């Protein structure tokens, strides 16, 4: 009998219960006991759901109140000293590391003011992890102040009658994905391996004592280009960890091709391996060849990253091939990765078109898929499920919903001229200086302003038909005016309208484009309590009418200052949607580029001549390995942006924005935007600024962290700008936050932006 396995399940709850209780706790409206009780309830639901579905190997320790990598940092005492000074409870230390903390002094507690650790993309997904941060003084040990999470949750499931397989990020990946703290920049995190291995060993021993038979130990860095010095660390690590006193270890990889690093793991004494055969089915032969007698092969054939139904025939064929290689008793049918990246349950979608809905599979449905495939390759009768699945796959492939001949014809018109501005940047800059007459250190924001409760209530009322379109438009215009007047009052130079009409920077556009489908409850965790509801690209994309012109024109009409039109770029819309799996990413991005070109041209025609096209996801789409696939991606990603933005006059200023990523200036240069803004506030490495010293166009390196409620002082802004100006010329530098202000409250936004503008004014006086 071939077993079924799931690598992880969404932690957020079917109705976003985790977000609600976490934010209630942060705001003082829920106790820590209520927070912990809700977490326990969510874990129990997930375990019971998987047990009921018939999944054989059920994960534990896949739950987190914020981020699973951050959990490990807390557990292993990798806590920078600045978070240990305030006598905080363990859960509050966790949240302070994840989002920063600023509290006024009370009679019983000193004031707290700490910034968050850096948050970066989890490989090429839209999930973000909190980056482990190490120093020479880091002392690894099991931090048992709040228990031992992997052991406690294993025992919790065991008490419910559910035998689970704990999930832990492996030591090589944990260190390699971390960074040196600002006081230890000469430290190579991987050099800490000998210090951390005894702590891993102790944790594994405690899991064995609790009754764990296997542990899923994730080493996803194996899909990256690893230096030989890092490759050699796997043998060192697993020779030290494996033994009779610890559970069996299943070394787990996902998101890519392991073959270039195969030598690093071919002789490891682990009980088995997991590989992603959704992303790289062609690696099966080579990875199977390294298995020794007794080692199992976990075959990731159900996509943990997308929402399309698994083709049972194709997936079963892959598993059957694995069985032929290593034997039926040594193969496990599994999800390709954790299901963290998919919505919880398709059954909660009551408004989806029935035809389209039949093409989808969310996390709950994927449980059934791994079970059916396992039964099928084991010889059990699942003919009804196979027939229904085949019919669904066939219907989608033949549907007219996916094909628009006009869009396909327009794609053929794209050439280099269409994707090139009328003049090079120096000539454009001359015209833009004459037109806008901006001061040195021009100030702006990235786009969104706080999405208040009042905004959400009125948007909901409009969606339900409780207020008219005229009433809703009047409300939105009032919100826009509030944002504009505030920006004028504090002296910002280039304004935004605040985006009160937008629910999400991708969904808002997807809802107005042909070729998209939408969910009502298809939430996925992006980071912490930030969840997104990605649109689904189901067919060829086009723009039937203008999407943003009305609000931008109104905003410009009430101010004499330049007003930015705000759009989300083609690659970001693609990356932050669930994409089609039947056509290439390049085709989808270029279709989006053409649709956005129409919008950019309409904005310019309506008098909006500063236009920002955000591409925060362009880095995350970069293939994980160097080579032709990566260079091809960079070419079509930049081309799709230029297709969108190259139809304007020289005097129209094109901006773009990037966040959550380590960026190569050459990637940005290829976009040929006039001004770019980049998340920067949590970058501690001075070399990162140096990389942009030769960037030819204008740039704004983000000066404060919008993911944290913490308010930076004017002096903090001044110090940050001084550091940047040691490397980057004042004549090209813009002053702005890291990202949009949607998730922040008005009081912190007002104070932070006021301090930022005052700092810019101080530098104008100096220069």
Swiss-Prot record:
Variant or mutagenesis effect after changing residue 707 to A/K = Less than 5% of the catalytic activity of the wild-type
> Binding positions for L-methionine?
446-448, 499, 614
Q: Give a GO cellular-component term.
A: nucleus
Cofactors required: Zn(2+)
Q: What is its EC number?
A: 2.1.1.14
Cited CDD domains: CIMS_C_terminal_like, CIMS_N_terminal_like
Q: Where does L-homocysteine bind?
A: 446-448, 499, 614
**What SUPFAM superfamilies does its record include?**
UROD/MetE-like
Looking at the keywords, is Chloroplast present? no
Binding-site list for Zn(2+)? 657, 659, 679, 739
Q: Which domain of life is it from?
A: Eukaryota
Protein name as it appears in the record = 5-methyltetrahydropteroyltriglutamate--homocysteine methyltransferase
Q: Which organism is it from?
A: Candida albicans (strain SC5314 / ATCC MYA-2876) (Yeast)
Q: Gene that codes for this?
A: MET6
């Amino acid at each position: 009998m071939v077993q079924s396995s799931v690598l992880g399940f969404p932690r957020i709850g079917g109705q976003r219960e985790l977000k609600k209780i976490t934010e209630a706790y942060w705001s003082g409206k829920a106790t820590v006991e209520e927070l912990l009780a809700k977490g326990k309830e969510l874990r129990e639901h997930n375990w019971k759901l998987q047990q009921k579905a018939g999944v054989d190997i059920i994960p534990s320790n896949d739950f987190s109140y914020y981020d699973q990598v951050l959990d490990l940092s807390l557990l292993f005492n990798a806590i920078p000293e600045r978070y240990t000074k305030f006598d905080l409870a363990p859960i509050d230390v966790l949240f302070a590391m994840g989002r920063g903390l600023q509290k006024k002094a009370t009679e019983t507690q000193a004031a707290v003011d700490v910034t968050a650790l850096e948050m970066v993309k989890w490989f090429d997904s839209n999930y973000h992890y909190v980056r482990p941060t190490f120093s020479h003084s880091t002392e690894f040990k099991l931090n048992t102040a709040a228990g031992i999470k992997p052991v406690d949750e294993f025992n919790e499931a065991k008490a419910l009658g559910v035998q689970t397989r704990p999930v832990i990020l492996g030591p090589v990946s944990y260190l390699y994905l971390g960074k040196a703290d600002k006081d230890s920049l000469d430290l190579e995190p991987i050099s800490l391996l000998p210090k951390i291995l005894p702590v891993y060993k102790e944790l594994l021993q405690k899991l064995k004592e609790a009754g764990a038979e296997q542990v899923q130990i994730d080493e996803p860095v194996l899909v990256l280009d690893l230096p030989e010095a890092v490759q050699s660390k796997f043998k060192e690590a697993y020779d030290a960890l494996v033994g009779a006193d610890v559970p069996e270890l299943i070394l787990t990889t996902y998101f890519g091709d392991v073959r270039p690093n195969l030598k690093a793991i071919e002789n490891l004494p682990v009980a088995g391996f997991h590989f992603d055969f959704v992303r790289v089915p062609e690696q099966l032969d080579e990875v199977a060849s390294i298995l020794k007698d007794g080692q199992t092969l976990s075959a990731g054939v159900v996509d943990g990253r997308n929402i399309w139904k698994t083709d049972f025939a194709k997936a079963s064929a892959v598993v059957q091939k694995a069985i032929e290689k290593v034997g039926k008793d040594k193969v496990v049918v599994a999800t390709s990765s954790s299901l963290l990246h998919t919505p919880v349950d398709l059954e909660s979608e009551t408004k989806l078109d029935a035809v389209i809905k039949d093409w989808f599979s969310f996390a709950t449905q994927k449980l059934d898929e791994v079970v059916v495939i396992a039964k099928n390759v084991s010889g059990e009768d699942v003919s009804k499920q196979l027939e229904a699945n085949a019919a669904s796959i066939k219907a989608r492939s033949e549907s007219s919903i996916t094909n628009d001949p006009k869009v396909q014809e327009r794609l053929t018109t794209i050439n280099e001229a269409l994707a090139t501005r009328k003049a090079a940047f120096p000539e454009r800059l001359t015209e833009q200086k004459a037109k806008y007459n901006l001061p040195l250190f021009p100030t702006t924001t990235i786009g969104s302003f706080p999405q208040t409760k009042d905004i959400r209530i009125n948007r909901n009322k409009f969606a339900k038909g409780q207020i008219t379109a005229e009433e809703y438009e009047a409300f939105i215009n009032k919100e826009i005016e509030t944002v504009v007047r505030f920006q004028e009052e504090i002296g910002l130079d280039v304004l935004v309208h605040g985006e009160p009409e937008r629910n999400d920077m991708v969904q808002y556009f997807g809802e107005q484009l042909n070729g998209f489908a939408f969910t009502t409850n298809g939430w996925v965790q992006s980071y912490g309590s930030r969840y997104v509801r990605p649109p689904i690209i189901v067919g060829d994309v086009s723009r039937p009418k203008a999407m943003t012109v009305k609000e931008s024109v109104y905003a410009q009409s009430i101010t004499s200052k330049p007003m930015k039109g705000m759009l989300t770029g083609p690659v970001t819309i693609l990356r932050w949607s669930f994409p089609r799996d039947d056509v290439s990413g390049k085709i989808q991005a270029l279709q989006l580029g053409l649709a956005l070109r129409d919008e950019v041209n309409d904005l310019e025609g309506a008098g909006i001549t500063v236009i920002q096209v955000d591409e925060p996801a362009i880095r995350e789409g970069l293939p994980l390995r160097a080579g032709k696939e990566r260079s091809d991606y960079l070419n079509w990603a930049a081309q799709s942006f230029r297709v969108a933005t190259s139809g304007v006059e020289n005097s129209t200023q094109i901006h773009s924005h990037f966040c959550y990523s380590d960026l190569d200036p050459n990637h940005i240069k290829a976009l040929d935007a006039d001004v770019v803004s980049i998340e920067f506030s949590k970058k501690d490495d001075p070399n990162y600024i140096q990389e942009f010293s030769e960037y030819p166009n204008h740039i704004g390196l983000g000066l404060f962290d919008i993911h944290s409620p913490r308010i930076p002082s004017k002096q903090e802004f001044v110090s940050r700008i001084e550091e940047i100006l040691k490397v980057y010329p004042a004549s090209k530098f813009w002053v702005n936050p890291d990202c949009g202000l949607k998730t922040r409250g008005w009081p912190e936004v007002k104070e932070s932006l006021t301090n930022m503008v005052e700092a810019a004014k101080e530098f104008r006086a100096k220069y």
